[in-house]
Amino acid sequence: MKRKMLKSKIHRATVTGADLHYEGSITIDSELMKQADILPYEAVDIWNVTYGTRFQTYAIEGQPGSGVICINGAAARMVSKGDMVIIASWIDIDADKAAAYEPKLVFVDDKNVPTTQKSENPGQGSLRNAI
């Protein structure tokens, strides 16, 4: 049996743009993608912290070090520049490995510069305890 687990997330990134007329996707600074282990064209969920909307799209690489987080295509109607979002990717893993699995978490500042990168371990000083 497989379990769907959080593979990685870019936590509380700031949307730098929204391009309604682009084909679709989310453009993410390629350095952030590498840190979060997100590949080009990989499916990602976007959770808009500012407005509570959620949608799925796919990632494309933006200029490294630019901090770009740009929502493209129809999903551009679901965000505004300056909104705070969480970008999540998923993995299917064997059930017997799920309990020990730890996702990659990339925390960024308001310019989308990474501040920390860590794994989340519930119950041991993780985000779960902070909520």
Curated annotation (Swiss-Prot):
Residues 112-131 are annotated as: Disordered. Keywords: Autocatalytic cleavage, Cytoplasm, Decarboxylase, Lyase, Pantothenate biosynthesis, Pyruvate, Schiff base, Zymogen. Its EC number is 4.1.1.11. Residues 113-131 have a biased composition (Polar residues). Pathway: Cofactor biosynthesis; (R)-pantothenate biosynthesis; beta-alanine from L-aspartate: step 1/1. GO terms for biological process: alanine biosynthetic process; pantothenate biosynthetic process. Pfam families: Asp_decarbox. Substrate binds at residues 57, 73-75. The keyword Electron transport does not apply. Its main location: cytoplasm. Catalyzes the pyruvoyl-dependent decarboxylation of aspartate to produce beta-alanine. HAMAP family: PanD. This is Aspartate 1-decarboxylase. The gene is panD.
